[in-house]
Amino acid sequence: MKSIIFNEIKKILECDFALENPKDKNLAHFATPLAFSLAKELKKSPMLIASDLASKFQNHDCFESVEAVNGYLNFRISKTFLNELANQALTNPNDFTKGEKKQESFLLEYVSANPTGPLHIGHARGAVFGDTLTRLARHLGYKFNTEYYVNDAGNQIYLLGLSILLSVKESILHENVEYPEQYYKGEYIVDLAKEAFEKFGKEFFSEENIPSLADWAKDKMLVLIKQNLEQAKIKIDSYVSERSYYDALNATLESLKEHKGIYEQEGKIWLASSQKGDEKDRVIIREDGRGTYLAADIVYHKDKMSRGYGKCINIWGADHHGYIPRMKAAMEFLGFDSNNLEIILAQMVSLLKDGEPYKMSKRAGNFILMSDVVDEIGSDALRYIFLSKKCDTHLEFDISDLQKEDSSNPVYYINYAHARIHQVFAKAGKKIDDVMKADLQSLNQDGVNLLFEALNLKAVLNDAFEARALQKIPDYLKNLAANFHKFYNENKVVGSANENDLLKLFSLVALSIKTAFSLMGIEAKNKMEH
């Protein structure tokens, strides 16, 4: 709707301007401060300019009123125009707020947790954000592909195999073992040890078989990770292996050398990242000739940036903040525009239950498992809460609030609005088709504002995607639900003289809730279950 209004205004004003959304919809639905920017050029006061501009909009079908107020140009949308938009939305509900196909393309890499254990709650935040960003981008018409980078090489995979070997020796063979400083622990390691012992037999468990044991366990963990993601309604298009990039390392090093991006010193090969804004240079090849994790990651990012996407997006944990300058430096040395590599950071999550820290999982050692939280509160509540705050800010929430059936539980409160609308239609004995001819002319000011809010979802979705600020969607839903409940409590619907107008208004509210929830990966309920 906002883009339509913008274009209508531009036809008349014939110049560029900013279109704002005033908080008080009783004053205006849209406003522009254009008169202030024209004041110097026209040598007139903003008030006079705004008044002159307002006079150009007389008898325009889109607007109920266009007024000059303190230098601003305030626009109120007409009921007739809002009704036209409502008819379009209700006639084609599956296309409501969808964007036209765009040329811009994106590759999103996210989650990419080491396949050494189940996903924990820290992984879950980036996973939910990435999946929702994907749903939103595709809905708005962008080409958007997703990928999981499987870290299946290096020391962490070897440690997984070693941890299982030591668990077999200790818990099954009852040998005395000495654990290294770093190893994986938890019930899942014991379970893997039991399964491996049954599969391979006693003779298999020696140090020389650690790589084979690690590979077997890594594959098991990747299956588990995919199950964890599926449980939260998250689907990633493709999984790529770190090992598959081994053969490309030398070519990447040659390219970096050619562009003076690396140098040798102290028997190591260094990335000259300090030349590109990093705080210091970074080792990419050790003295023994082995590549560091950074080396493998550079090869992978070179491949991603070469695939022709307009932008490559990564979602990383906030602890990877210092990693950004070195990766962007490497991409610049390789001839890419580092602005086309976008990094979104997912901050830490603190989980409470009844005001106390949530218990760590025995299965995973010192972590809260994503699957445990989904089992307790459901994927809808998990997804909502992880989207309720900007991804790069710390998130603390008490899962007890998400089990309440009142306004303190936002998922319940919003779903209750959706279910309430279905209940009202049932009580009136009507369906949406029965109210399509209603013209909405009887709506009072609060009703018009509620209708405007429901129809303004497209603008919210565009803003949320462009700013990568997905919290705008749950914020919108909370306000929409609150305004609906208030309006419902203040207005008689069934049996009223304007019943059809109100039911048509409500159907738009329900459509907006269902559409926004769907993009968040949440099911809108037609009936509340107790």
UniProtKB/Swiss-Prot annotation:
Reading the lineage from the top rank, the first entry is: Bacteria
A GO molecular function term, named singly, is: ATP binding
**Span(s) of short sequence motif 'HIGH' region:** 113-123
Please give an example of a GO cellular component term from this record. Answer: cytoplasm
Give the UniProt subcellular location, in the record's own words: Cytoplasm
Similarity remark: Belongs to the class-I aminoacyl-tRNA synthetase family.
Substrates-to-products reaction catalysed: tRNA(Arg) + L-arginine + ATP = L-arginyl-tRNA(Arg) + AMP + diphosphate
Q: Show the stretches that span the lipid bilayer.
A: none
Q: What is this protein called?
A: Arginine--tRNA ligase
List keywords of the entry alphabetically. Aminoacyl-tRNA synthetase, ATP-binding, Cytoplasm, Ligase, Nucleotide-binding, Protein biosynthesis
Q: Mention one GO biological process in which this protein takes part, according to its record.
A: arginyl-tRNA aminoacylation
Q: Which CDD domains did the record assign?
A: Anticodon_Ia_Arg, ArgRS_core
Q: Looking at the keywords, is Phosphoprotein present?
A: no
Please give the PROSITE patterns that the UniProt record associates with this protein.
AA_TRNA_LIGASE_I
What is the originating organism of this protein? Answer: Campylobacter jejuni subsp. jejuni serotype O:2 (strain ATCC 700819 / NCTC 11168)
- What Enzyme Commission number does this protein have? 6.1.1.19
Oligomer status and interactors: Monomer.
